[in-house]
């Protein structure tokens, strides 16, 4: 995750 608990659901690139 990018380290965000608010947009980690859509930012699972890492």
UniProtKB/Swiss-Prot annotation:
Gene (name only): rpsS
Coiled-coil annotated spans: none
Keyword Cell membrane: no
Signal peptide: none
One Gene Ontology MF term: rRNA binding
UniProt key word Ribosomal protein: yes
Protein name: Small ribosomal subunit protein uS19
Reported function: Protein S19 forms a complex with S13 that binds strongly to the 16S ribosomal RNA.
Entry GO CC: ribonucleoprotein complex; ribosome
Family named by the database record: Belongs to the universal ribosomal protein uS19 family.
Keywords, comma-separated and alphabetical: Ribonucleoprotein, Ribosomal protein, RNA-binding, rRNA-binding
Superkingdom, taxonomy of origin: Bacteria
């Amino acid at each position: 995750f990018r380290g965000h608990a608010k947009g980690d659901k859509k930012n699972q690139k890492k």
